[in-house]
Regions:
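Conserved helicase motor
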Residues: 58-66, 139-142
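Glycine-rich, flexible N-terminal cofactor/catalytic loop recognition
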Residues: 1-62
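Alpha-helix capping/helix-boundary segments
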Residues: 35-37, 118, 168
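Short amphipathic alpha-helix with an adjacent loop that forms part of the alpha/beta core around
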Residues: 68-77, 152, 207-212
Length: 270
């Protein structure tokens, strides 16, 4: 049996009784970082008197998951196993997706526990999400790839939720302000933590507000939907026409087509 266990994104009290019950019977824990997970479990033992079995820990993250899953002995899942990312819900801008696919392919019984998730928290707190929305995770870091992603996000006819780092949050808001100054944006910083802060305003105003704010922390944004009934989406042909190197071009094409990036890259450099 395999459990996917969400961990608090800032407030230890968000741990559910169900999570504690599952952890108490776990025999194997796969985790993004064993040091972070062991520290978290120590906190649970102190605060909630959690009693753990003699647990075996295995590091499983984006850099080693292919190798680990290729060589893993399926008999390990006869034990009570769990996967935990460092903070938040596994698979949501965090590792874990490959393990889900592995479980499906190999008929390993699994269950996802409910818990902390900045994406859903921001969606509810924003007041902008009623039904459909798009979650983009973290945008590309720089260059034309980032510009294309931002423009596409602003063109969508439903709210868009984005994670952003403290280093790039102001740049993102200024870029949006330059493209659509009246666009409403909700921002939550350090969700569920002691210094949680919320902002809600037009992009042009937020660009000025954030200039004078302490921007340390983790950010989640909800961008209001496009008010245009006619909107342009960047097509595959538009990306092919961009004067950018093959690598970022292959990333963009992979995102909009779903085709493997390496395959696209090989075709581009032929």
């Amino acid at each position: 049996m395999l459990y996917f266990i969400p961990t608090p994104i800032g407030n230890l009290s968000d741990v559910s009784l169900h999570i504690l019950e599952v952890l108490a019977k776990c025999e194997v824990i796969f985790c993004e970082d064993t040091r972070v997970t062991k520290k978290f479990l120590n906190l649970l033992q102190t605060r909630y008197s959690l009693k753990l079995k003699d647990v075996s820990f295995y590091s499983l993250h984006s850099h080693n998951e292919d190798e680990i899953l290729k060589n893993i002995d399926l008999s390990i899942f006869k034990k009570i196993c769990a996967y935990m990312s460092d903070a938040g819900m596994p698979c949501i801008s965090d590792p874990g997706n490959s393990l889900v696919k592995f479980a499906q392919k190999n008929k390993v019984e699994y269950e996802v526990l409910s818990g902390s998730n900045a994406l859903i928290l921001a969606a509810v707190a924003s007041g902008l999400v009623e039904k459909e929305f798009s979650f983009l995770g973290f945008l590309p870091n720089k260059g034309d790839e980032r510009k294309v992603a931002i423009q596409n996000a602003l063109n969508l006819p439903y709210p868009v939720i984005i994670y952003e780092s403290p280093k790039r949050i102001l740049n993102l808001i200024k870029t949006i302000s330059g493209l659509d100054p009246q666009r409403k944006i909700f921002i939550i910083k350090e969700a569920t933590k002691k210094f949680e802060t919320k902002y809600f305003d037009k992009a042009i105003n937020l660009a000025q507000i954030l200039e004078n704010e302490n921007l340390n922390g983790e950010f989640c944004l909800v961008i209001d939907k496009s008010k245009n009934t006619k909107f342009e989406t960047i097509l595959e042909s538009d990306i092919l026409d961009l004067d950018i190197p093959p690598k970022p071009k292959s990333k963009l094409l992979s995102k909009i087509t779903g085709i493997n990036q390496k395959k696209i890259y090989k075709n581009l450099i032929k």
